[in-house]
């Protein structure tokens, strides 16, 4: 209850209204508490003194009875407006609601009453509009024609004047009279600054400070006729045609025809539309059922219209006119979006066309609006099962399973969904088993592929190794060819040295006779070999190029046999130099011991590839034996005598063995000296016949002098005559013939190869 409003009404109407409220609102609990407190001061109040007042109260008895009967509605808080206060400025809202001229214009009221009511209702800060009537030095006077805010009054015929002082007129220039800007007849909008109600005088101002804060943005000053309020323009039209009634003018306005005028005015006045206030008990919303309201009635009406469209669509569907049926269903859903029958019918049409997803959506909407609809549930279950079958064909088993389960949740007794779900589970189990088997097969295939790849890699590695070996052999063959070139160069150098030292040998022939006596000594052979080693330079370490390359070495030996005649001349020349020097070195001591040790070393190297070497030597001996017969026959007799001398010198040469170290001046030279000794021993004992032949030739040279060189020049002719005898010797001793005419540096290389093969044979196999 609004207590303030109740107290105001009781204070106005007195105890008569209080007694009527007690009799009418005795059942209302809100009035029981309020009337008890409000009646006490009324009981003690003195009766009104005049009879005239009693008569006036008697006239108001009907109003008091109306208030007492409708007190629960009149004093309810729901009547209190919660809307913000409307703006007091008159806006041009012609399109929103009907703007009418002032009501007193349609009534016959005297001008004195209008003037009195105007000065009673006018307040400071209100906006007035008028025309300038006269301009004076202290200001200008204006005649009011209408009000710009607040109440609406027709004051154009009242001739009310207002003064605007000079101090309230803003200047429009820095220097000049502010009144010069204004002229008589200008329409001025101004704010009321002061009111003299008794003398009916008004003072206005053109400054915005005279207006209240919520109207401070309004422009004051000169305005045009178009900026006049709408109600004033309507009043001017009404004055020109005074025969028009209030209703005709209201109906002719555009705002009155606006369909949203009620909502606009209710919002502007702050009245709730859901619970509209009414003083008629029959029109109160509490006394009506929900089905009697407009919303429910509208739903019923739209549902009936939608059902008519659905029936027409079903008839089209039975005939086979699916397009027309779809149009009718859509029309029904436009009228009523939640029409269950229209949704079910359209879903069935979608299902027959094959668009199952749309059908499922319509059936689900129908079940949401009406959960007890049988056809919607039934059709939805069938559509879900059919859609699950489609997904199962697409191999989307999980989605199909979800559709089957959804159908079972809607209807647990739906057998089609149960059967489809069981079949799907069985198929999924079988497919899983097949996948596992396929995975196992794939794993096995992968392992096989890996094995085959490993085998291929092994084969490739073997091929690479074989290719590397071939490359090494080719590189070694190239090194052998370079060695051949070096041998040929050494032979050419030996021939040139032979010519240079020819004269020196003649001078040394006499000294060689004296050295002939010392050949009986055991150390004479040792002296020749040590001198031989000193004549040759230290060879380079080329053992790496001859590893496992015996065939190339054998080819090299064959080339050396072809150059045996020049080599024989070089060797005789070297022996002549050695014997003429007269020195007795100690290098040859212990030759038999070195021979035995070399046999063991060479044996290990020869056992690796005996077949190839023997075959090669036999072929080489058979091809080259004829060219060497003449020379071997000439040296046979001297070999026998030299062999006897060497056997006698074995014991004596051991005493000279330690002295061989004296000739080594550096590690490289010492290593070379020991290797040269070993090679000399091998050369001496493995090819003893060659050595004896050389010794015999040396003795002949000492006795005959220059005839040796003539015999060497004719060695080619002797070879032709003595070829058969040399063939026999080559069969008996192939090894001695291979190495008989080689230079000392090649013999050293062969010895290094033999030592390397021995070391390689002694290493443990990995």
Curated annotation (Swiss-Prot):
InterPro entries, per database record: NA-bd_OB-fold (IPR012340), S1_domain (IPR003029), TPR-like_helical_dom_sf (IPR011990), TPR_rpt (IPR019734), TTC14 (IPR039190)
GO molecular function, one term: nucleic acid binding
Residues where Phosphoserine is found: 666
TPR repeat intervals: 209-242, 306-339, 341-373, 381-414
Compositional bias ranges of the Basic residues kind: 497-506
Stretch list, region Disordered: 35-55, 463-743
Residue ranges, compositional bias (Low complexity): 475-496
Entry keywords, A to Z: Phosphoprotein, Repeat, TPR repeat
CDD domains: S1_like
Compositional bias of kind Polar residues: 539-550, 594-605, 661-673
Domain S1 motif: start-end pairs: 125-207
Family membership noted in the UniProt record: Belongs to the TTC14 family.
Annotated protein name in UniProt: Tetratricopeptide repeat protein 14
Organism: Mus musculus
Gene designation per UniProt: Ttc14
